[in-house]
Swiss-Prot record:
Composition skew (Acidic residues), residue ranges: 142-169
Biased composition (Polar residues): 172-183
Organism: Emericella nidulans (strain FGSC A4 / ATCC 38163 / CBS 112.46 / NRRL 194 / M139) (Aspergillus nidulans)
Pfam families per the UniProt record, alphabetical: OrsD
Encoding gene (name): orsD
Signals that turn on the gene: Expression is induced by an intimate physical interaction of the fungal mycelia with the bacterium Streptomyces hygroscopicus. Expression is repressed by VeA and MvlA via histone 3 acetylation by the SAGA/ADA complex.
General function of this protein: Part of the gene cluster that mediates the biosynthesis of orsellinic acid, as well as of the cathepsin K inhibitors F9775 A and F9775 B. The non-reducing polyketide synthase orsA produces orsellinic acid by condensing acetyl-CoA with 3 malonyl-CoA units. Further modifications by the decarboxylase orsB and the tyrosinase-like protein orsC lead to the production of F9775 A and F9775 B. The functions of orsD and orsE remain unclear since only orsB and orsC are required to convert orsellinic acid into F9775 A and F9775 B.
GO terms assigned for molecular function: DNA-binding transcription factor activity, RNA polymerase II-specific
Name of the featured protein: Orsellinic acid/F9775 biosynthesis cluster protein D
GO biological process: regulation of transcription by RNA polymerase II
Region (Disordered), start-end ranges: 137-189
Length: 501
């Protein structure tokens, strides 16, 4: 059976010769167990995804360990990158490595030698990534070599291909880009007119839109007085600020070409920032660590906000659609100071929701929000039935009480600072048990998180925060995927898409 292309933009190809389904945008084969999440990554939602999955289930897809690899004389497989690697020439050994560094490791571990003559160059491919990577040698034609995109310089002093260290789809993190170690491949920041224009934009515009990690006030003073002086001493940190400025410009481009250029520069600045941060994270002082952590979290949010499709220029080496709800939660929570959980106060705190007086709310919007949160436990009980664990009920009530109080902060003004602070600090005030329930996809806890997204994340976007553009809908769609399906739709209706004020 010849390979067959299908799906939106014809991104999927089934190759019956090997029993694999290749994604042409991500450039690797998809495991059966990761099919649903992979299609969602490409923003293929429920109806279209179910139709695609039904069709793919009719195909004979093999598990990675069962796929027979092509012989070395075979031409490259269409849709997979060709890597300039090495083949071990030791007697009885034909091990393949993507870099000379890894080949030397193979010699030490398998042959007890360090002889660079025991290898020859080879063109390699792999169907899968992460823990299921299995290289095979191919023989490109002249035409293939002209079009070939080598993903590594294969020099011991330069960045090695790092497909082995990327997690597969089941691991939750996957990247179609190549991770490099620090070296000449990382772009440098030259002090030219373009760089100066990005810095000027950060000082005059971007800094005014960013949250402050220390309090709910405007972040402009924090970024100008605390972040910029440190960035002037650390080039990699300055790259983080320039990346945020480029992202901000990409969010509001003058035209499509300008938008793509800003995305490209954002990705380059981000790479140098992350390279420097990885090198110095363990030795940085507390102040520098706070600024760098905040930049990293905000760049991840910007990456999600700007990723219109998986093939976009990537600002961060991860999917444009967050693979897991937990990655969104941890990113948002990390933008504000951590707070020690008060587990002993859970019961007392939970009763606050029962004592709410909506007449004391600051305005009609907050009164409506408190009414809805107050009524939510009863609606969940009607839908999910009598709870088995009374302690978990108290945990949910405590989380709702904290949400009501954080909404008071978020809706106190039309400014981004209070809106972000209320949105992010909620996660520092909920019990640890609540976070455990969310991680286990406990339906009632997901309904509570859905209200956080519809109310507080949506509120932050409405206040003008470009960093969370579309994030509320992404969270709600992620949650909807995890909720049990029922005939009358009661569970889905609990994900209150319409309660945002």
């Amino acid at each position: 059976m010849p390979p067959v292309r299908f799906g939106p933009r014809k991104i999927l190809e089934y190759d019956g010769r090997y029993g694999v389904l290749i994604c042409h945008e991500c450039r690797y084969a998809i495991q059966k167990s990761a099919l649903q999440s992979h299609l969602l990554r490409h923003k293929i939602y429920r109806a279209d995804r179910q139709q695609l999955v039904a069709m793919i289930n009719e195909l004979d897809l093999l598990e990675p360990d069962d796929v027979l690899l092509p012989p070395p004389e075979s031409p490259p497989i269409d849709g997979l990158p060709v890597i300039a690697g090495y083949r071990c020439t030791a007697p009885g050994c034909a091990n393949l490595c993507a870099s000379l560094k890894r080949m030397k490791g193979h010699w030490r571990e398998s042959h007890g030698i360090a002889d660079a003559s025991l290898a020859r160059p080879a063109k390699l491919q792999t169907f899968f990534r992460g823990t299921k990577i299995r290289y095979f040698e191919v023989t490109p034609t002249t035409e293939d070599e002209d079009d070939e995109e080598n993903e590594s310089e294969n020099d011991e002093e330069e960045g090695d291909v790092d497909l082995e260290e990327q997690e597969d789809d089941n691991g939750g993190r996957q990247s179609t880009t190549v991770t490099t170690s620090p070296g000449p491949s990382a772009p440098s920041v030259n002090v030219d007119l373009e760089t100066l224009s990005y810095f000027h934009h950060f000082m005059s515009a971007t800094s005014l839109t960013l949250p402050c990690p220390q309090d709910m006030q405007s972040g402009a003073q924090y970024w100008k007085e605390k972040a910029v002086p440190q960035a002037l001493q650390q080039r990699w940190l300055m790259c983080g600020l320039l990346a945020l400025a480029a992202c901000h410009l990409a969010a509001f481009p003058d035209n499509a070409a300008a938008g793509q250029q800003h995305r490209k520069r954002a990705a380059e600045f981000s790479l140098e920032f992350r390279t420097g941060w990885r090198e110095l994270a363990d030795t940085s002082g507390e102040g520098l660590r706070e600024v760098a952590t905040e930049i990293e979290c905000l760049l991840r949010c910007a990456h999600w906000a700007l990723a219109e499709s998986p093939c976009d220029q990537r600002i961060m080496p991860e999917p444009g659609v967050p693979e897991h709800l937990q990655s969104i939660i941890s990113t948002i929570q990390s933008t504000v100071p951590a707070a020690a959980p008060h587990e002993a106060e859970t019961s007392a705190y939970a009763t606050r929701i029962l004592r709410w007086n909506t007449s004391e709310a600051g305005n009609s919007v907050l009164a409506e929000i408190r009414n809805r949160l107050h009524d939510l436990p009863a609606r969940m009980a009607d839908t999910f039935g009598r709870p088995e664990n009374i302690q978990d009920v108290l945990v949910l009530l405590s989380a709702l009480a904290a949400m009501g109080e954080c909404c008071d902060t978020s809706f106190a003004s039309e400014e981004v600072g209070p809106a972000w602070w209320g949105m992010a600090t909620w996660w520092t005030r909920v019990p640890l048990r609540f976070k455990e329930l969310v991680a286990r996809h406990y339906p009632a806890s997901l309904v509570v998180v859905a209200h956080w997204a519809a109310l507080m994340v949506n509120r932050t976007e409405r206040c003008g925060c470009w960093l969370v553009k579309g994030l509320a809908m992404t969270i709600l769609l992620r949650i909807a995927e995890r909720l049990p399906e029922d005939d009358d739709g009661n569970v889905q209706r609990l994900v209150a898409l319409t309660i945002a004020a």
